[in-house]
Amino acid sequence: MIRELCRGFGRYRRYLGRLRQNLRETQKFFRDIKCSHNHTCPSSPTSGGGAERGPAGDVAETGLQAGQLSCISFPPKEEKYLQQIVDCLPCILILGQDCNVKCQLLNLLLGVQVLPTTKLGSEESCKLRRLRFTYGTQTRVSLALPGQYELVHTLVAHQGNWETIPEEDLEVQENNEDAAHVLAELEVTMHHALLQEVDVVVAPCQGLRPTVDVLGDLVNDFLPVITYALHKDELSERDEQELQEIRKYFSFPVFFFKVPKLGSEITDSSTRRTESERSLLYRQLIDLGYLSSSHWNCGTPGQDTKAQSVLVEQSEKLRHLSTFSHQVLQTRLVDAAKALNLVHCHCLDIFINQAFDMQRDLQITPKRLEYTRKKENELYESLMNIANRKQEEMKDMIVETLNTMKEELLDDAANMEFKDVIVPENGEPVGTREIKCCIRQIQELIISRLNQAVANKLISSVDYLRESFVGTLERCLQSLEKSQDVSVHITSNYLKQILNAAYHVEVTFHSGSSVTRMLWEQIKQIIQRITWVSPPAITLEWKRKVAQEAIESLSASKLAKSICSQFRTRLNSSHEAFAASLRQLEAGHSGRLEKTEDLWLKVRKDHAPRLARLSLESRSLQDVLLHRKPKLGQELGRGQYGVVYLCDNWGGHFPCALKSVVPPDEKHWNDLALEFHYMRSLPKHERLVDLHGSVIDYNYGGGSSIAVLLIMERLHRDLYTGLKAGLTLETRLQIALDVVEGIRFLHSQGLVHRDIKLKNVLLDKQNRAKITDLGFCKPEAMMSGSIVGTPIHMAPELFTGKYDNSVDVYAFGILFWYICSGSVKLPEAFERCASKDHLWNNVRRGARPERLPVFDEECWQLMEACWDGDPLKRPLLGIVQPMLQGIMDRLCKSNSEQPNRGLDDST
């Protein structure tokens, strides 16, 4: 039992050390991110002076101010929780019905009679102090304040040799009034294997200090494995109250052990109670909520189940304490590893999402600026054409309007009611001031009607432009200016001025423009002509005559020319201001994009890989704690970066395949860690091989290297082996459909596989395909342009370092060639190549597989489209899939009716 306990606590310390190291590196990572962010971000505007700021300054200053990395931080709650776990070492805490039985259990655990087990006096008079047993090279006893200093006190044990600690040293003397002496614990150091791994604490007597207080002190510095020693057949009222208090304030499971009576022999297994004879103790513990009534909890818990309280009433089953302690310790470690891994994964997802955002920003911002410049020029030229073209139209329209509206205007003028002018009903003359007011109101009536017709004509053209392309232009500007302060959206304001030039003509036409002043001069001449020595009477005829004179004096050509001139002036002014502000905006974005690109590179090459490795370690720790290290079976195959073994059973999955990878350097570690994160983040899909978990083997190869063991679903064979063995046409086409479905799913998750080939397509026993080996799989935003993949399946643009997910379409085209050929023989164009370099050069120059006689025309066209040298001309997989389905329906149906002339079965 002692050996098993030592092994369990030693294992806990070992894994706790790894968790502590991972937490320390995680904290350092977040500190580095914070320092990097503080160094990158500009100072707050409030800290500087009132320097002049324009759009460029605002973009440069606020581009990273929102802080793409500011949200990457260690959540304080999780950090505190994890720090507390790694700081707490385990200890075995012994509670019990009385002090005698606690001492008995301690002696059983250590296998030596170190504490007296026969005490004089009752439990009520017992004053047993807290005892703490720790490891030391020599046996030594001392009094010390918990976690503080040792007290200078002469103990009975110091006066001579002893095998059992004297009772006087164990108890607090009644006449002792020294508070420190009362609180002090008796610290016993012993050279013992168990104490080398874990401290053992015996709780003080209940009368001296409540158990809840003792436990409360312990949990701040230790993880207690709680044992409760029993010697009676039932719990007393005091025992029940103590256990209720513990359950109320703490959630720790308890190992209840019934200590055999002194002098009695070990209970024979034949005398054990059956399930129907459950003890009173058991029923009491069920009532208290410690045990479950659903099963006979007799001290034989499963090795990997979550820790639960257990009652052991047979003394020979004390060995189950090792299983119980394993569960307690494992639960603690698994919960901590899971919490740490959640932090890692959450931040990694933020990194990847931000990498997408930054990549899109780098790609789309220059295009938006160019689009904005182009569309504004088109808008400006269109509006200038309107101004030039409309002058003659406006002149004709004014003449036509005056002719058609003349009678209506004269009638309206004759019948109009004047405002603020009292006109005598008997037709008596009025004063000169009233006459001028009446003439002005008639003039305003005519001008407003004419103005409305002109403005409507002009505005209809501008509205057409607004509806045609101005909306997109405005949205582009909003996205370019969104990082700026609302008050400095200068470029958008100038665009609005361009669009509103026609409306401004309408507003200023009768409120101060040169046209209005010209008309007012003409009206004054009319007044002079119709004003006699004595003021006239305001009659219907007089009003018609004033209106007639005003209409006849208007010059349609001058009016049209003035309107268009005013429109052009406003347009030119707004266009020039817009161009200047756009240049300023572009300069600001240029600085911001430079910083964004630097940050994007740092995320891809430093931050994300570093965090991914920590995530791999925390997840692997969780997996090894839950499922142990997998056992390697026979070797199934070897690849460029690892060996694949058979693994019969792991984590409830069987059979499994185990890929052992020994990363040779930091870069390969980072790539593997990111691959693992992408695979674990993917939802399960029937066309992708499941990844069950990972374990890091720190003693791989006899401790010479560290290996990552990836445990995944095991399938029947790969496509290469399947084609060699022979597959029917329908099976092969179904495999092609399965592969397309799998690639489409990866692309829908933002991932690019980059290594689609025969060996990376696995077949189950029904010959349905699943894609495996996501070693080169990455999100588009995280791709660095590295040249990866298998030469035969590599698209030409892979060699340039600038590529997207269409490289998987190219690779599928090559794969489809093999599927249609029904064999694994290399295409002639590739077989002639003497080396990889020779092959790559030929592919870049356009070398492709040849057409075989067995190929169906539609299949060949699909292959050619997929491996087109121009990525933009390759079909989307959403188009490829229905095409494949159509080919399969056509060929397989015809094949069932008559021999197929296009593709031969390879069986």
Swiss-Prot record:
Q: Where does the record place a coiled coil?
A: 373-409
Q: Known PROSITE patterns for this protein?
A: PROTEIN_KINASE_ATP (PS00107), PROTEIN_KINASE_DOM (PS50011), PROTEIN_KINASE_ST (PS00108)
Question: TM segments?
Answer: none
Enzyme class at the top of the EC tree: transferase
Recorded hits in InterPro entries, A to Z, give: Dual_SerThr-Tyr_Kinase, Kinase-like_dom_sf, Prot_kinase_dom, Protein_kinase_ATP_BS, Ser/Thr_kinase_AS
The record's keywords, sorted A to Z, are: ATP-binding, Cell junction, Cell membrane, Coiled coil, Cytoplasm, Kinase, Membrane, Nucleotide-binding, Serine/threonine-protein kinase, Transferase, Tyrosine-protein kinase
Main location group: cytoplasm
Taken from the UniProt entry, a GO cellular component term is: cytoplasm
Listed under catalytic activity are: L-seryl-[protein] + ATP = O-phospho-L-seryl-[protein] + ADP + H(+); L-threonyl-[protein] + ATP = O-phospho-L-threonyl-[protein] + ADP + H(+); L-tyrosyl-[protein] + ATP = O-phospho-L-tyrosyl-[protein] + ADP + H(+)
The Protein kinase domain covers 630-884
**Chain positions recorded as ATP binding sites:** L636, G637, R638, G639, Q640, Y641, G642, V643, V644, K659
Give GO BP annotations, semicolon-separated.
cellular response to fibroblast growth factor stimulus; negative regulation of apoptotic process; positive regulation of ERK1 and ERK2 cascade; positive regulation of fibroblast growth factor receptor signaling pathway; positive regulation of kinase activity
Q: Where in the cell is it found?
A: Cytoplasm; Cell membrane; Apical cell membrane; Basolateral cell membrane
Active site: residue positions: D755
| A Pfam family it matches | Pkinase
A GO molecular function for this record?
protein serine kinase activity
* EC identifiers of the protein: 2.7.12.1
Q: Which PANTHER family match?
A: DUAL SERINE/THREONINE AND TYROSINE PROTEIN KINASE, DUAL SERINE_THREONINE AND TYROSINE PROTEIN KINASE
The job of this chain, per UniProt, is described as: Acts as a positive regulator of ERK phosphorylation downstream of fibroblast growth factor-receptor activation. Involved in the regulation of both caspase-dependent apoptosis and caspase-independent cell death. In the skin, it plays a predominant role in suppressing caspase-dependent apoptosis in response to UV stress in a range of dermal cell types.
Q: Which family does it belong to?
A: Belongs to the protein kinase superfamily. Ser/Thr protein kinase family.
Task: List the protein's name.
Answer: Dual serine/threonine and tyrosine protein kinase
Q: What organism does the record attribute this protein to?
A: Macaca mulatta (Rhesus macaque)
Q: What is the lineage of its organism?
A: Eukaryota, Metazoa, Chordata, Craniata, Vertebrata
